[in-house]
From Swiss-Prot:
This is Exosome RNA helicase MTR4. Residues 16-74 are annotated as: Disordered. The lineage of its organism: Eukaryota, Metazoa, Chordata, Craniata, Vertebrata. Pfam families: DEAD, DSHCT, Helicase_C, MTR4-like_stalk, MTR4_beta-barrel. The modification Phosphoserine is found at S40. Gene3D superfamilies: 1.10.3380.30, 2.40.30.300, P-loop containing nucleotide triphosphate hydrolases (3.40.50.300). Residues 23-33, 43-52 have a biased composition (Basic and acidic residues). Catalyzes the ATP-dependent unwinding of RNA duplexes with a single-stranded 3' RNA extension. Central subunit of many protein complexes, namely TRAMP-like, nuclear exosome targeting (NEXT) and poly(A) tail exosome targeting (PAXT). NEXT functions as an RNA exosome cofactor that directs a subset of non-coding short-lived RNAs for exosomal degradation. NEXT is involved in surveillance and turnover of aberrant transcripts and non-coding RNAs. PAXT directs a subset of long and polyadenylated poly(A) RNAs for exosomal degradation. GO terms for biological process: DNA damage response; maturation of 5.8S rRNA; mRNA splicing, via spliceosome; RNA catabolic process; rRNA processing; snRNA catabolic process.
Length: 1042
């Protein structure tokens, strides 16, 4: 039905289909003058303005015309197809997840819903009989009681609540229950540091607990295993025995699933887990918790409860501190009401302080002028007894700079100083004497003794843990941290201070999102200790009340899938018998979220089709044919315009005084006069070539309002009833919608307003002289364009115009009315078509094309056969999950590692695991530069194969993802240098070096396994030697939590 408006009828010339270029421009040869695009003359005109009138009444068919009057069935009359299409689309219901959601009850600010398979009836939860698996010394909150009841009934539950609300209670209960029933339980967390802390907590509570993080394995046969999600994923792919005995899996911080890089691991894991396992998901507040539960229910055919609460045990007060001011403004009170008047006062202070505030930023090089704002606030917090405070900054450098400004202050008593020293010396006791003298270790102690701490990724892990312990013991009163501190670790303070409301997210500076603000500000207010938490936001540039309100009162970020394919995933799924990569795509949360849109689209199609059928057009066939002719003319007009706009044709005619018509999207300026034109070169973003841009300066009638505020580029046309002001506006060539054959005389000096306005009078004179519209330059006769393509288009135009004039409708008095109806109906047809495309897309599994491309790459590189059977190379790549498995496998099979020493191989592998940016590129010696070049050659080959397989890949970006910045550092460390020595070789933070080394050790272990898989003992021993070379001293000092 909808394709009734296609143009396949209109191949006017045999074997030459009309080129689809666009809409709306046509032309007519009239008395030898090219009269320009439709609509350019007044309605009365004899020019094509939607309809052409012509003296020609030749009804005889032109040879070249297609005799289509009889072949075209009534476009709108294909009723049956409509009905069929709807029913066909409704069969999508089979695809739709069959899940229903039942609301259970809502008690004391906590909602409880359950998602269950559509064919099951909801059975109310049974109250517990007998003793609880674990007793608590305090009264449980409503949401904790509800969640525990789900666990007692052996049903999965997602608990979504604020950080300090006490979600861990629900997890502990599930562990206690599993241990009592002699079942195994797995607790997974997103980061190793968090796993270590959780292990510590669980071990103190239950004893029968083990830990597996890739770095460390403790008691792997325990009934309760704490592990990172990556380890669980690889256990599932390996078909580990452990999985057979597991009854419960607890996912901590499930909102981490939206992490663009590692979130996919959660999804894979949840999909791979067997249906008989039950789950406890702990999450920060997410608005779409119910959707997640529906997915779990759809995936594992079991009910999944959602317990959601916005409750905060300690309410928060939010203040703004405007830079340059000296006081706090309460903008959200403890009841959660936004106080707009206070917000506006704060912004007023900011405006008044204006330039003063700008000068107060700390200089990166020198000190700051006088005490900084941060210093003022922290001092005030201490005086008012609002400590402990966490001060969040968005860069490691800022953290340290602010902390160093505090050195004049001292928040600890002598007693506390002694304790700090004792904890500190015990913590670093395991380090060698040399490592104890590292600058970072020596510098941090004096700060800690004063009750000031620093916490960011660049710190040595052992210092980071020491600081966490001191903070939780109340020995640090002011902690300067980056946002990673807000991840998971339950270490609340009384006050949270943001040093800035903007952050750099790798691409640009932006306001922090309300979700990030909620996560970080949630650290304020300690349960049972503070009656309220205090959050202070420092603002140094004006924000509108809308942005302010959105930030301070916005909702949490939804949990959206970050699922994407990886080669390791595809290969592992090809290796495992009972599951394939297609299954993984179909079952992903990504696909599920996509399916949820289907009912809306079906509804849209239905409504549009009803509207469509309501529009009745008399003599429909004939009207549609006429409509199509006009559409076709419009399209051809656009093509002609494209020829005219080619700089080589139009530039010679853009002399000063030439009348041109300017139209920019919705803004139609009408006729103006060319003043000048210039050529600007524009660098193309991807190729770096110069692309000349031609800018024409045109004198146009603009609205005075639009000229007030900014550059002339922002000028808007004057409204019909307004006099407007003539102004010279720079216009890109393609915005000229018509070029006239008329030229006017323009005054030499256009600065005086009167001179400019005089030109407007001249233009109006010309318009009076040509009531049928100002004559345009004829592309062939005037502009002398000899292009064969253009001649063809003009021939087609003549044929169509002839056809239009001879159409019975053309001179019909009701033409406009029926034509408008026809246009409306055609638009609905287009909408239906696009909605159906949407439906079709909704049925297809997303990313399936990418999967095909990836399989193509695997076949071409010899990792798998054409029938998806995994080859030797593929089995090797399955062993490597923490770095680029394709490239490493290729390097191994090409013998790239064979001639390298263990130290060289280790240094080369560091490129795969170092992820930060370093400003300086090390000067590499040939023994490192050689292997690096070979690796890059190998990577280029993979990029080439990927591009040939139609994968979107940019060779530059791909190559730059391997960062050689620490190669020399790792090489020197592997040859036995001290940590102090390698720190001096680079500007990378100590903590980042250690993180790189620990990742490297994990990769080396995987490389050992990979070498073992091909039976290359020599290579296996080389990688193992690499491990022993780097695994020493402070780099691998054990975590204090273990």
């Amino acid at each position: 039905m909808a394709d009734a408006f296609g143009d396949e009828l209109f191949s006017v010339f045999e074997g030459d289909s009309t080129t689809a270029a666009g809409t709306k421009k046509d032309k007519e040869k009239d008395k030898g003058k090219w009269k320009g695009p439709p609509g350019s003359a007044d309605k009365a005109g004899k020019r094509f303005d939607g309809k052409l009138q012509s003296e020609s009444t030749n009804n005889g068919k032109n040879k070249r015309d297609v005799d289509f009057e009889g072949t075209d069935e009534p476009i709108f009359g294909k009723k049956p197809r409509i009905e069929e299409s709807i029913t066909e689309d409704l069969s999508l219901a089979d695809l739709m997840p069959r899940v229903k959601v039942q609301s259970v009850e809502t008690v004391e600010g906590c909602t409880h819903e359950v998602a269950l398979p559509a064919e099951e009836d909801y059975l109310p939860l049974k109250p517990r009989v007998g003793k609880a698996a674990k007793e608590y010394p305090f009264i449980l909150d409503a949401f904790q009681r509800e969640a525990i009841q789900c666990v007692d009934n052996n049903q999965s539950v997602l608990v979504s609540a604020h950080t300090s609300a006490g979600k861990t209670v629900c997890a502990e209960y599930a562990i206690a229950l599993a241990l009592r029933e002699k079942q195994r339980v797995i607790f997974t967390s997103p980061i190793k540091a968090l796993s270590n802390q959780k292990y510590r907590e669980m071990y103190e509570e239950f004893q029968d607990v083990g830990l597996m993080t890739g770095d460390v394995t403790i008691n792997p046969t325990a009934s309760c295993l704490v592990m990172t999600t990556e380890i669980l994923r690889s256990m599932l792919y390996r078909g580990s025995e452990v999985m057979r005995e597991v009854a419960w899996v607890i996912f901590d911080e499930i909102h981490y699933m939206r992490d663009s890089e590692r979130g996919v691991v959660w999804e894979e894991t949840i999909i791979l887990l067997p249906d008989n396992v039950h789950y406890v998901f702990l999450s920060a507040t997410i608005p779409n918790a119910r959707q997640f539960a529906e997915w779990i229910c759809h995936l594992h055919k079991q009910p999944c409860h959602v317990i959601y609460t916005d409750y905060r045990p300690t309410p928060l007060q939010h203040y703004i501190f405007p830079a340059g001011g000296d006081g706090l403004h309460l903008v959200v009170d403890e009841n959660g009401d936004f106080r707009e008047d206070n917000f506006n006062t704060a912004m007023q202070v900011l405006r008044d302080a204006g330039d003063l505030a700008k000068g107060d930023q700390k200089g990166r090089k020198g000190g700051t002028k006088g005490p900084s704002n941060v210093f003022k606030i922290v001092k005030m917090i201490m005086e008012r007894n609002f400590q402990p405070v966490i001060i969040f900054s968005f860069s490691k450098k800022d953290c340290e700079a602010y902390a160093l400004q505090m050195t004049k202050l001292d928040f600890n008593t002598d007693e506390e100083k002694k304790m700090v020293e004792e904890v500190f010396s015990n913590a670093i006791d395991c380090l060698s004497d040399e490592d104890k003298k590292l600058p970072q270790v020596e510098h941090v102690l004096p700060l800690l003794k004063r009750g000031i701490g620093i916490h960011h990724g660049g710190l040595l892990p052992i210092l980071k843990e020491t600081i966490e312990i001191l903070f939780s013991e109340g020995l640090i009163k002011a902690l300067f941290a980056t946002e990673t501190f807000a991840m998971g670790i339950n270490m609340p303070a009384r006050t949270v201070l943001f040093t800035n409301a903007r952050k750099f997210d790798g691409k640009d500076f932006r306001w922090i999102s309300s979700g990030e603000y909620i996560q970080m500000s949630g650290r304020a207010g300690r349960r049972g200790m503070d009656d309220r938490g205090i959050v202070i936001l420092m603002v140094d540039e004006k924000m509108s009340p809308t942005i302010g309100k959105q930030l301070l009162k916005g909702s949490a970020d939804p949990l959206n899938s970050a699922f994407h394919l990886t080669y390791n995933m595809v290969l592992n799924l090809l290796r495992v018998e009972e599951i394939n990569p297609e299954y993984m795509l179909e079952k992903s949360f990504y696909q599920f979220q996509h399916y949820r849109a289907i009912p809306g689209v079906v509804e849209k199609v239905k409504n549009s089709e009803e509207q469509y059928n309501k529009i009745v057009i008399p003599n429909e066939e004939s009207v549609v044919i006429y409509y199509k002719i006009r559409q076709q003319l419009a399209k051809l007009g656009k093509e002609i315009e494209e020829y005219i706009h080619k700089p080589k044709y139009c530039l010679p005619f853009l002399q000063p005084g030439r009348l041109v018509k300017v139209k920019n999207e919705g803004d139609d300026f009408g006729w103006g006069v060319v003043v000048n034109f210039s050529k600007k070169s524009n660098v193309k973003p991807n190729s770096g070539e110069l692309d000349p841009l031609y800018v024409v300066e045109v004198l146009l009638r603009c609205s005075k309002e639009s000229l007030k505020n900014s550059a002339t580029e922002a000028a808007k046309p004057a409204k019909p009833d307004e006099k407007g002001e003539m102004q010279v506006v720079p216009v890109l060539v393609h915005l000229l919608s018509a070029i006239s054959s008329v030229r006017l005389y323009i005054p030499k000096d256009l600065r005086p307003v009167d001179n400019r306005q005089s030109v407007l009078k001249s233009i109006q004179e010309v318009q009076k002289r040509f009531p049928d519209g100002i004559p345009l330059l004829d592309p062939i006769d005037d502009m002398g364009i000899q292009d064969q393509g253009l001649k063809k288009v003009i021939q087609k135009v003549e044929a169509f115009e002839h056809r239009m004039y001879s159409h019975p409708l053309h001179n019909d008095p009701n033409l406009e009315t029926v034509y408008t109806l026809c246009e409306k109906k055609a638009q609905i047809a287009i909408d239906i078509k696009s909605a159906k495309r949407e439906l079709k897309k909704a049925r297809t599994v997303l990313q399936m094309d990418e999967l095909k491309c990836r399989k193509r790459v695997l076949r071409r590189l010899g990792f798998a056969t054409s029938s998806d059977v995994i080859e030797m190379k593929g089995r090797v790549a399955c062993e490597i999950s923490s770095a680029d498995e394709l490239l490493l496998t290729e390097m191994m099979f090409n013998g790239l590692f064979n001639d390298l020493s263990a130290e060289q191989a280790t240094a080369l592998l560091s490129c795969f695991v170092f992820q930060e940016n370093s400003s300086e590129m090390p000067k590499l010696t040939e023994q490192l530069a050689g292997p690096l070049r070979q690796m890059q050659e190998c990577a280029k080959r993979i990029a080439k194969v990927s591009a040939e397989a139609k994968l979107e890949i940019d060779e530059e970006t791909y190559l730059s993802s391997f960062k050689p910045h620490l190669m020399d550092v790792v090489y020197t460390w592997a040859t036995g240098a001290t940590f102090a020595h390698i720190c001096k070789m680079t500007d990378v933070f100590e903590g980042s070096i250690i993180r790189c080394m620990r990742r490297l050790e994990e990769l080396l272990r995987q490389m050992c396994q990979a070498a073992k898989a091909i039976g290359n003992t020599e290579l296996e021993n080389k990688f193992a030697e690499g491990i022993t070379k780097i695994k020493r001293d402070i780099v691998f000092a054990a975590s204090l939590y273990l």
